[in-house]
Amino acid sequence: MAVFTRVLRDELEGWLKDYSVGTLTDFHGIESGIENTNYFVTTSEGEFVLTIFEVLKAHELPFYLNFMAHLANHGIPCPRPIANLQNQYLGALKNKPASLVSKLEGTSVLKPSPLHCVKVGKLLANMHLAGKSYPLNMDNPRGPAWRKIAAAKVWELDRKSTRLNSSHG
């Protein structure tokens, strides 16, 4: 389940007043995912995806949201962040960072064919080319430093799990 933060209709209606997307007609949680809360949002103006960020902090998100906008502006078929009335891509909902992006058409391809792989490869190449003109840089938050910390945590959890399992044996 990936709806960690429940949003009531009146809360979402109030939040959407800060966007030029029309009036709310429907919304429902997206059950897939592992880290953020996501909702499909339908308004009188179109379909969107609301993301409530559960782990990343507000100061960490502008890089990603601006990069998504950059890619979309360069013809990459990716969600386009929707700016609020203050021309910001990031807002707050339920005291957490939140953003609204365009909803893409399509479905998940669970068994890709070689043709799918070719199309993904071409799209990835175009994405890299479009990304070259993005003016900002950021260290990979899941790079070498994170891997060391994660490995230590996994080792510690494995040790505790082994100890717990042996005490119940």
Where are these regions (language model features)?
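Juxta-kinase regulatory segment immediately upstream of eukaryotic protein kinase catalytic domains
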Residues: 1-25
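ATP-binding glycine-rich phosphate-binding loop
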Residues: 19-42
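ATP-binding pocket architecture of kinase catalytic cores
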Residues: 43-136
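Single conserved hydrophobic/aromatic residue that forms the stacking wall/gate
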Residues: 164-169
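Active-site catalytic-loop/activation-segment of kinase and kinase-like phosphoryl-transfer enzymes
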Residues: 1-4, 141-163
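Short acidic/polar alpha-helix capping motifs at helix-coil junctions
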Residues: 1-3, 29-34, 52
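Proline- and acidic/polar-enriched loop/turn elements at helix boundaries
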Residues: 28-29, 83-84, 139
